Amino acid sequence: MPPKVKFSKEAMIGTALQLVREEGIASLTARALAEKLGATPRVIFGQFTNMAELQAEVIVAAEMVVVEYIRKALEDEKPFRSVGVASILFASKEPQLFQLLFQNPSKDPIRRFQDFLPMKDHSYQLVLDSIVADYPLTVEEAGRLYQHLFIYSHGMASMVASGIYQFGMEEVIGLLTEVCQSLIKEMVGKK
């Protein structure tokens, strides 16, 4: 009779995610995770074929953390602006997860930037819908606006996650609003 599984796959992923939150993806080793679980590395390999499989699950779990930040932002009175603020807040509160998701070399680089957001952002369509609902833009223009603001807010978030500069909330809102309004004015003016 095989030994009873003491730790579920989900519990291991949750503990691994916490380890990565605290110390970064490089700290996610079988030994470190086993120590956190109070077990031996053998327990991990009873649930996962190898560490690459576990790391892939941790990345999915980290993506769900971002999705939750964006979901909450989309409930705000000014959802699109709040999405930009949320990404910077995520970088501030979860710098290791931000670096894992957005600052590591990709195994599968994207060839055209316009493909990036639809592929990487689980809330892409919801964000586009919020832009079209709040601004006099077409879906195509909303996609371009989101692309521009993503690049801008990603730069700010990268500065925050790497510890270069910690933007204040008023500063973030002011900068994002100014850029967003300028882009919308430019797009609407071309019609």
Predicted regions mapped to residue ranges:
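N-terminal intrinsically disordered/low-complexity leader segments
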Residues: 1-7, 190-191
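Helix-turn-helix
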Residues: 11, 19-53, 57
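Alpha-helical structural segments
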Residues: 11-18, 22, 53-72, 82, ...
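Hydrophobic alpha-helical connector segments
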Residues: 57, 70-97, 139, 145-149
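Short secondary-structure transition hinges
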Residues: 89, 96-126, 158, 162, ...
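Amphipathic C-terminal alpha-helical segment
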Residues: 100, 150-168, 182-191
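Amphipathic alpha-helical packing segments from all-alpha helical-bundle domains
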Residues: 110-136, 143-147, 174-185
